[in-house]
């Protein structure tokens, strides 16, 4: 093997230059350019010094636990990944006695940066199953299941059986039934047909002892819609199946092989009446049914999942944008000046255009994720303490929940889509080395993209959000109050707002631009809805006719939300020494977003055709500003090499050394002849064809 010290030596202007050893110097040079305190930027990102201290402590604990080390996962088969995931879940849960709820969630999220499979295999229980118990069960029911071991995952493992083979996004169309039997005070759970088989259920194949099962409530022949029932799947001592339960493994997936996704069928499975979660919908022993004032009250666990996925979009995006930008800072290709080293790819304007807006988007995601988490915590706290008989308080809670339901749907959709795009664009930006399994992009993409379809298909979520935006606008026209996120619909001044010589670098102007475009799209869609319904279409038919407009409204409103959240956070908590650099990043994100959808701003009249060139010039300007500080922006994420888990993205920039070592560590030198040489390769290379005999005869 060639010594690294002998590779790639060239002489330029009488100086020795080595492309193998130069990258660490290049990245050190980038760090020397940084003009802001990275510590202050990190504290801004994570909400203050106290949070940063907690995150750093949790990261250190994760790194020091050998069970959680993922460095060998890229070559690990499915069966081993699943077994390893259980060991890692045990390691993570070992901290729960001392962890606060916030710390436990954050510990799992941080580990999920490099191990999405374990993150979700545990999260199905802690987030979805326990979220369903907490959100839809009474206090007495929650306490009961905690005593059974649910909170500590002791003798108990929960899964979340919502999706069916024949239904996913349309929860109201689920077919599994729960029939109340008054004589025995029980429900009988049944899978009426193959299409009603519970499908994709994480934890079902191997782990789960219980499930939160979504089923149609049937009482005295009447269908009361889908409710949640806790059903035992396995005996907690022997792990054997309970009577009437059939389940299996759905097998190989595109990614997340560590998760034991399975299918479940129920045949006359009896459960006590108390196993129906009855915080909102209730069934008495006499069969009397009381319904909640809002169906979404039952689906609180889903909202919590979506809010978490917004945060996960940031956690994963920060890893891959860091890898791509560090690599861009040390990778040299081609050159424009004779006698000089090749050019760093980060210095090519087009490469800046590819990556730096995605860096800005990653920061924006963090601001929106934190805002959504606060909104979710406030709403769920209210729902936990509210008296269902207090109509006024319940009415306010329902308004808050509707707003959270809509905003989390849009943010979940567009942040998970963006994260998938960031992973793939960063892979492409790393050229051939991005295709190596050891640099993480392939596994991460395969693991991540399920986020775009589970817990709400992104397109369906956008259409649902668009419908809600039109309904908010209709309600406002009838005198109903607007939620805070759509308050701009009441701003009549937006109709006349234009750039009109104002400064496009002014955040107030940029926010107004997005509000005007969002307002215009929603008002126009609402006008069309009114026109269609007056023309004879039912509301549902009119909404279907407006599907494209609904999607567009959701897209614009969500981007406005991201823009606003970014600037609001800067104004609220950025220290003076980092604020200008954050404004540069926020302006890049906002102007790039305008450039991407410039037609909207022309249509609404905020911009004139002559203004588009100015937008493009400003995007180029901010790319240059951000480029000079790029090492600081990425270092501020605070990710060690353990969390990067990609040799071309290591902190020291020694990409070729680490990459070459990783490949050889995972693929040690062996017999140069492959194990199939004698059985397959040699017979192929030395095969005798009939044509060979004919040629020999011809020669004779």
Swiss-Prot record:
Database matches in Pfam families: ACOX, ACOX_C_alpha1, Acyl-CoA_dh_M, Acyl-CoA_ox_N
pH dependence of this protein's activity: Optimum pH is 7.4.
Reactions catalysed according to its record: a 2,3-saturated acyl-CoA + O2 = a (2E)-enoyl-CoA + H2O2
UniProt cofactor(s): FAD
Temperature sensitivity of activity: Optimum temperature is 23-38 degrees Celsius.
High-level lineage: Eukaryota, Fungi, Dikarya, Ascomycota, Saccharomycotina
Membership in a protein family: Belongs to the acyl-CoA oxidase family.
Molecular functions per Gene Ontology: acyl-CoA oxidase activity; FAD binding; fatty acid binding; flavin adenine dinucleotide binding
GO biological process entries: fatty acid beta-oxidation using acyl-CoA oxidase
Subunit structure and binding partners: Heteropentamer composed of five different subunits.
Primary role: Oxidizes aliphatic acyl-CoA substrates of different chain lengths such as hexanoyl-CoA, decanoyl-CoA and myristoyl-CoA as well as aromatic/heterocyclic ring-substituted chromogenic substrates, such as furylpropionyl-CoA. Of the above substrates, the efficiency of the enzyme, exhibits the following order: decanoyl-CoA > myristoyl-CoA > hexanoyl-CoA > furyl-propionyl-CoA.
Localization terms from the record: Peroxisome
Pathway as given in its UniProt record: Lipid metabolism; peroxisomal fatty acid beta-oxidation
Main location group: other
Keywords, comma-separated and alphabetical: FAD, Fatty acid metabolism, Flavoprotein, Lipid metabolism, Oxidoreductase, Peroxisome
Enzyme class, broadest EC rank: oxidoreductase
Name used for this protein in its record: Acyl-coenzyme A oxidase 3
InterPro entries to which the protein is assigned, alphabetical: ACOX_C_alpha1, Acyl-CoA_ox_N, Acyl-CoA_Oxase/DH_mid-dom, Acyl-CoA_Oxase/DH_mid-dom_sf, Acyl-CoA_oxidase, Acyl-CoA_oxidase_C, AcylCo_DH-like_C, AcylCoA_DH/ox_N_sf
Cellular component, GO, one term: peroxisome
The EC number(s) this enzyme carries: 1.3.3.6
